[in-house]
Design a protein with these regions (language model features):
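Active-site-adjacent structural elements that line small-molecule/cofactor binding pockets in enzymes
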Residues: 1-295
Length: 295
């Protein structure tokens, strides 16, 4: 539960386009200032942003994507997360299409050990087709990607529990994979981002943390969907932490302290337990002012 005057926890997200020196410095300062969580987005190229959704817009195959330096999320995250001592860390979110579930699970278990149990595994079905095409990564239809995500979540659960994991499906197979080390706290928290009915069912079954992007009204509606999905399987929805991910488009939520405080209050009223801001380095003055409210 938040202990600050704002009534919600506050997290910050840095992207893979940050340089190694800059992300080290920022994460160190943000932890010292008292923010509750620090996250890394998982992309390998940028496509610009729309003015409507804040998500990368499709880039025509005939137009090369922008030449923006991007570091790999998990490598960068391992470097900075292991240097923290208090703050929760995580991915927001890793698409199922980038890595085999067994390798992703091993990466997550490694970060869990490196942070002393302060890692949340954020997962999603992926949505940037041009990014996949650019790097030769398969991008199946949405329904298949959600099925792959469900299998990934089941594999993660298997690797956390028994001594060996075996699994066989249309997409993945494991054959007596050794399940060591175990998570520091017995379980790595899983964040799921998504809004469609099947994704909500996966959240209800597997998630410890649900993250969504959108307006306060939209977020409130998705939380109601989550509660309905939980009710269908007999799960208490209060077991799932609820957060909103706020990015720079269409309106920069960190353009001023007043703007940031208004945004935080709006999403607190919508039912959020945590507000997670996407940040740039030039946001630091507002971030420092926000930090004073966390004391």
């Amino acid at each position: 539960m938040p202990t600050n005057e704002l009534g919600v926890e506050l997290g910050l997200t840095t992207g893979s386009r940050w340089s190694w020196p800059d992300v080290q410095s920022f994460w160190s300062e943000a932890e010292e200032m008292g923010f509750d969580s620090l996250w890394m987005s998982d992309h390998i190229m940028t496509e610009g942003y729309t003015t409507e959704s804040g998500r990368p817009e499709p880039t025509s195959p005939d137009v090369p994507p922008p030449l923006v330096p991007m570091l790999e999320c998990w490598t960068l995250l391992a470097g900075v997360a292991s240097r923290t001592s208090r703050v929760m860390t995580g991915t927001i979110v890793s698409p199922v299409t980038f890595r085999h579930p067994s390798m992703l699970a091993k990466q997550a278990l490694s970060l869990d050990q490196m942070t002393g149990g302060r890692f949340t595994l954020g997962l999603g079905a992926g949505y940037t087709e041009r990014e996949h095409a650019a790097f030769g990564l398969p991008y199946p239809p949405a329904g298949e990607r959600v099925t792959m995500l469900e299998e990934q979540l089941e594999i993660m659960r298997l690797l956390e529990t028994g001594d060996y994991a075996s699994f066989k499906s249309e997409y993945y197979s494991l054959d007596q994979a050794p399940c060591v080390p175990k998570p520091v706290n017995g379980h790595i928290p899983v964040m799921i981002g998504g809004t469609r009915p099947r994704m909500m069912r996966l959240c209800a079954k597997y998630a410890d943390h649900y993250n969504v992007a959108g307006s306060p009204n939209y977020v409130r509606e998705r939380f109601a969907d989550l509660e309905a999905a939980c009710e269908k399987i007999g799960r208490d929805p209060s077991q799932i932490k609820r957060s909103v991910g706020l990015f720079i488009a269409p309106v920069d939520p960190l353009s001023s302290l007043d703007r940031a405080l208004h945004v935080i209050e709006s999403f607190r009223e919508a039912g959020c337990d945590e507000v997670i801001f996407g940040v740039r380095q030039d946001h630091m003055p507002v971030i420092e002012e926000l930090a004073r409210r966390l004391a």
